[in-house]
Amino acid sequence: MKVHSSVLIEGEVEIPEDVEIGAYTVIQGNVKIGKGTKIGNRVTIKGNVTIGENCKIFDGAVIGEAPQHLKYEGEETSVEIGNNVIIREYVTIHRGTKLDKGKTVVGDNVMLMAYSHVAHDCVVGNNVIMANCATLGGHVVVGDYALIGGLSAVHQWARVGEHAMVGGLTGVSLDIPPYTVASGQHAKLYGINIIGLRRRGFPEEVIKAISKAYRIIFRSPLPRQKAPEIVFQELGQYEEVRKMVEFIKSSKRGVARHHKD
C-alpha cells in the first residue's frame, strides 16, 4: 500500500494493499475502498462511504460530506460509488438523507469532471459523464450513458433519462426523456441524440423507431397525455420506445417540451 506519511486515517477504514493515497488526504469513518483505486492529494472521504475498484480520485475531491439540507440532523447515511469511476479535482459528492433512501449512489464507469457536484440522495447510473461544474440537486436520478454538459444544473427531484444529452449552461427543472437532447436556460428538447446512439451501436432501425416516437409525442398535434399510448401501440415492440413511454408516464415533475412549443 502506497500511502503518504501525511495521510490521516480514522475509524473503521478498509484499504487494500494496492491502493495509493496522496499527501494530506483525510479518510474518516466507516470507509471501504476497492482494489486498485488511486486517491490524490488533499482528498476528503468521510462518513459511511464505499468506493469500488480501480477508481481514480483527483486532488481536492470531497466524498461523503454532510448533505446541504436544513432538515439533516446528523443521521447515519451513506455514499456508494461503483467501479472504474473517475472523480476529478474538487468534485463534491454528499451523502444521503432520511427524507429519501438515505444514500447517494454513483454507478460504474462514471466520469465526474472538475468541480461537478452530486448532491444528497442522487442516483447516477453507469457510464455517465458530467462535465466541469455540472451540478445535480438533491434526489436527482441520471440514467445510464447520460451526458450532462459543463455549468449545467439539474433541479432537485428531476430526472435525466438514459442516453440523453444535456448541453452546457442548461437549466433542467423538468424531466429529460431518454435518448433526447436538451439545451437552454429553461431546458427544451432538440430531438434525438442520434450521434450518441450511433456511437453506442444502436441499430438504425431502433434509432428510426425512437425518432418516430419523439415526433409523435413532442411534435404532433395529439394531446400530450394520449400521444404516449399511441406510440406504445405502434412501436411497443421496441424496448427503447417502451422505456421512453414509461419514463414520460411516470414523471412527477413534468417533462421538458420541444423547443418550438
Curated annotation (Swiss-Prot):
GO molecular function: acyl-[acyl-carrier-protein]-UDP-N-acetylglucosamine O-acyltransferase activity
Catalytic activity: a (3R)-hydroxyacyl-[ACP] + UDP-N-acetyl-alpha-D-glucosamine = a UDP-3-O-[(3R)-3-hydroxyacyl]-N-acetyl-alpha-D-glucosamine + holo-[ACP]
SUPFAM superfamilies, sorted: Trimeric LpxA-like enzymes
Keywords: Acyltransferase, Cytoplasm, Lipid A biosynthesis, Lipid biosynthesis, Lipid metabolism, Repeat, Transferase
Subunit relationships: Homotrimer.
Underlying gene: lpxA
UniProt superkingdom: Bacteria
Species, as recorded: Aquifex aeolicus (strain VF5)
Organismal lineage: Bacteria, Pseudomonadati, Aquificota, Aquificia, Aquificales
Pathway of action: Glycolipid biosynthesis; lipid IV(A) biosynthesis; lipid IV(A) from (3R)-3-hydroxytetradecanoyl-[acyl-carrier-protein] and UDP-N-acetyl-alpha-D-glucosamine: step 1/6
Function noted in UniProt: Involved in the biosynthesis of lipid A, a phosphorylated glycolipid that anchors the lipopolysaccharide to the outer membrane of the cell.
Localization terms from the record: Cytoplasm
Protein name: Acyl-[acyl-carrier-protein]--UDP-N-acetylglucosamine O-acyltransferase
One GO cellular component, as annotated: cytoplasm
Biological processes annotated in GO: lipid A biosynthetic process
